Amino acid sequence: MYQILTNLTEQISNASGFAHLAILILAMIIGLFLLTKGGDWLSDHSSHMAEALGVPNVVIGLTIISIATSAPELFTSIAAIRGQAEGLILGNIIGSNIANISLILGLVLLIKPIDTKGAISNNQILILLLLTISFCCVLFFNPTQTLSFGTGIALFGFISFYLCWITTRALKKRNSDVSDQGSDLKDVESSNPLTFSAFVVFLSAVALWIGSDFLVFGAKNLASLAGVPEELIGFTILAIGTSLPELATSISLVRKAKNDMLLGNIVGSNLFNIGLVGGVAGILGPVNSQTPHPWIDYLSLVLITALFCYWLKGRKLDKKEGMFLLAIYLAASSCTWIWNG
């Protein structure tokens, strides 16, 4: 798909510079649409399957929905490596994690306040903070600012262990509560068969694959046309685009008052962006930072994550915190554009 788009654009660009720009923008719009719809389908139907199996809400948010909403970042990173646009990857991972907390949670808090008390365990909070700091430190203290094969293996190994650990805990809880949920599971299965959900999950994966090719193709060539680093495009346009499934999911969850699932989705999504997406990218890479001052992005991510983890310790969040988070996102984006643009 990526090669077909490249050949088509080369033919059009020879005839008209405007047509070249138009097709790049159109490719990004199509890519964002497919990624958003694919992420929505994957999130909705994978969470349905988990609920039908009796998995608790917070665990669904930390695992199933988090993996589903991180799928656009994963597919985009793989497409970026295939399309030799590795500069998009680090910007996308860091930018998406910043957007998940400051932009998405900020917008959600403008809709409805959230009480974080008891929503996320201290273990999950500590894991998120330590993984974020470790990821940024490894990149910062590496002279070449490279996400290497060894780092990729370590990240992938960690996220695999984390997934096994939290799944084991969920299965133990389900077994202890299965007698109370038996009748509910029948109702869920009859209203929306698991086989149909599994089929939609497959279709969503196809949409994510095609959408990621379109988005990476448009972003890479647009960065080249504008003369800005690919990583900067990844930090902003790609990060917001691939975070749209998280935004749609979060708005839906806050309206249903599923705060534990919402916060679990943000925590889990950030964990999987670093562990799964970063791990796979490092294994398939290596991935090099292409910005002159990448430490700005690392520092922004660590500070924003630390603030989020502090707030998860039982604070009630409302519009004031929402406005503050949005201001932080604008400040972080402005700094990276000024220093790295």
Locate each region found by the language model.
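Hydrophobic alpha-helical segments, chiefly the membrane-spanning helices
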Residues: M1-G341
